[in-house]
Each structure stands twice: as structure tokens, then as C-alpha cells.
Amino acid sequence: AIQRLNLSGSFMLLLFFVGSFLFFEWHYRYFYRFLEQFVLFQTSESYAHTLLGEPGGGVEYMASGLTQCFSTPFASSATIALLLTLAAGGLALFLKTAGTASGNLWIALLPGLLFWFFPQESIAPLLTVSLACWLAVLYNAIKPSWVRYGAGLVLLTFAYFLATPAHLLFACFIAMSEAWRREGTKSTVVAVAALVWAALLPLIAMRTCYILPMREA
């Protein structure tokens, strides 16, 4: 079963949410009200069809949809703070379920703090990181067996089509989790297989799902 964070960890995540909200509300109150996705989402009828027809387009479309509420006061800051907290919470749970000795939540806050210093125009990267972290938590929640490894393969493929490059980050999480388990050859094989499958997914997709006519290529 998926473990929970302790009370101190939950309180720290709450403080991180409040701090993120205040930071982005103070420094980027109007910046996120004028995004390309906001205009395209409203004016282009083919926007959804175009995005959903390419790898990672699903998360881009979700990000574009979320930006529709950014014209509402406090909406952009609250959305970004929530996504940062979700990513931090997912990473903290992954570290806990992976059986590492590190219970320090500060490590899980690092990706969010990086976004403070290097904010992006789109919130798609936040959705991507959050998805990868929680897929890793889901993977660790399954008992080590062929079911777990099969689920990892399916989830990697799902992450590629929905939110590439989330599959690469998720594959790294799988490799880290298997390495920390230290079960000998099996863990090594699973870790390598996850990384190889994540690397091959774009090549396989280009040969099967995203074949371009010669004229377009």
C-alpha cells in the first residue's frame, strides 16, 4: 500500500505551498496572465487535435486548459503552488517507499525550488514532473513481481504518449528504486530494461504511431 508522510512532513509541504503561493503572487502576478496557450486555446479550433496528435501533447493541452483560469485573481499562483507541492509530495513518498534512509523532505523540495529561480512560461513542465513522481510512487506500491514489472512497462509507455519526457524521469526513478532494493541480477535487469525501453520509445513511436508522409518529412 502507498505509505503516507508523517505529520511533520505534511506540515512542511503545507508551508512550501504557502511559500510558493506568496512567491509567485508577489513576483509573477501578471506574468502568467499573458501566455501563448491562453490565446491559442481560445482561438484555434485545431489546437486540441494538433497537440493530442503528438507525444507529450496531452500534458500540453492540460496546461493550456489550466491557464484559462489564470485571469482570475490568485488563480495562477495557487495552481503553480499546488503543482509544486504535488511534485514535492510525490518525490518524498517515492523516496520513502523506495526504502532509502533519507527521510529529509528538503531533498524532495529541490525541484520546486529550482522552479522558483527558473520559472517557465508554461506550467507543462510542472505537470510532467508531478506525473513522473506519482507514477514512481504507484510503481513502488506494487509488490515486486512480474505484475509490477509489467505495470512499469505500461506506465512508461503511457507517460511517453501523455507527457514526454516524463517517461525518461520515470525510468530513472525505476532504476533508482531497483538499485536501492539490491536484489542482485533481477534488480539490475529491471533497471536497465526500464532505461532502454524509455530510450527506444520515441524510435518505436516514430515507426508506428507518428509516421510522416514523405512530402511532410
Where are the language model's segments positioned?
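Transmembrane alpha-helical segments of multi-pass membrane proteins
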Residues: 87, 103-114, 149-160, 188-200
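Membrane-interface segments at or immediately adjacent to transmembrane helices
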Residues: 212-217
